[in-house]
Amino acid sequence: MMEFFPEIPKIQFEGKESTNPLAFKFYDPNEVIDGKPLKDHLKFSVAFWHTFVNEGRDPFGDPTAERPWNRFSDPMDKAFARVDALFEFCEKLNIEYFCFHDRDIAPEGKTLRETNKILDKVVERIKERMKDSNVKLLWGTANLFSHPRYMHGAATTCSADVFAYAAAQVKKALEITKELGGEGYVFWGGREGYETLLNTDLGLELENLARFLRMAVEYAKKIGFTGQFLIEPKPKEPTKHQYDFDVATAYAFLKNHGLDEYFKFNIEANHATLAGHTFQHELRMARILGKLGSIDANQGDLLLGWDTDQFPTNIYDTTLAMYEVIKAGGFTKGGLNFDAKVRRASYKVEDLFIGHIVGMDTFALGFKIAYKLVKDEVLDRFIEEKYRSFKEGIGKEIVEGKADFEKLEEYIIDKEDIELPSGKQEYLESLLNSYIVKTIAELR
């Protein structure tokens, strides 16, 4: 078997004092926290598209990436090489999961029938490699946005033929996701939206989107796919206005169409900020709705208005993200998928590894800090005290549905002063700083 990364050793944990860029400083996969190895808390995953398909191309320049599989000119040889490279990459980084779009792993043919046959050959290669590896599929999905046929959308297209093609493509993607033991299946509507309402039948598009998702649910039941269906919200890009704008919008859509019981959310950090939210906001919304399924781990540049998909390095963000995951009970059929790409000028193979290492370290550290915050209940206690008025007296009656406008008016009408608690935001931010510093100091 050809080795694709001979210059890269198996990445080891060396501790926080290490200056080796090809070593973990905070991520020890076998470190046991709360009775479970860290790797099982975090469930890291490699995104096939960014790691093995992205070439460093941008709207203003040609590809820059130096990749060992680029030596292959035949599309099938390159596809097989990428699969083999994936397993070597995961094993050297001690990552146990990967995710893919159908068109990432195999090239398209002239017809859908031909494309499916090509896809089957690559899936067989993946299955062969899985036999000798502990690498598993976290989730699969279909690329319903790159091909020109999807210029008007897939489930929300104006063409019944395109709708049929998209349905057949998702049918096949569900089949191979099941065949490979995927824990979930993601729906991301990059072209499900509009550029202008001047040419859009908004009602029909939304109804057709619901019909499409319902068909997917029904087919999954038919073939016995028990993985978790996930919606990945994003407000814009490539489409000006996308229907799965954020968690709240997508949940309202699912609820309105009686689909909410079948779906959870795959939350991406950079999508949250594009929607004008923090990463934690989207995770909190999903958590309180009981719909936090999985995470696409990355970060954006707040000075730029597009999806930069950078590797996560912000300890505050990862701490607050893992706080929400822990409070939700941890991942079940989900994990932390690095939907992140190295910068265009970081074109060496080594940079691929370094990007994943820093992302894994940052989330590992964030988890350790968040675990202490949850265990010590410092935020819980403050919030409970802040809202204490709803635990007793008239507040308790409000919560229990025993108060109405007349009763509340009678209660408040002669009160002269209302004393409010301080929000203490500065204190809590200081407390978060202290937990970060203290946790790092205690690490070996």
UniProtKB/Swiss-Prot annotation:
Mg(2+) 2 binds at residues 268, 271, 307, 309. Keywords: Carbohydrate metabolism, Cytoplasm, Isomerase, Magnesium, Metal-binding, Xylose metabolism. Mg(2+) 1 binds at residues 232, 268, 296, 339. Its EC number is 5.3.1.5. GO terms for molecular function: magnesium ion binding; xylose isomerase activity. It is found in: Cytoplasm. GO terms for cellular component: cytoplasm. Binds 2 magnesium ions per subunit. Its cofactor is Mg(2+). It catalyses: alpha-D-xylose = alpha-D-xylulofuranose. PANTHER family: PTHR48408, XYLOSE ISOMERASE (PTHR48408:SF1). Belongs to the xylose isomerase family. This is Xylose isomerase. It comes from Thermotoga petrophila (strain ATCC BAA-488 / DSM 13995 / JCM 10881 / RKU-1). The lineage of its organism: Bacteria, Thermotogati, Thermotogota, Thermotogae, Thermotogales. The gene is xylA.
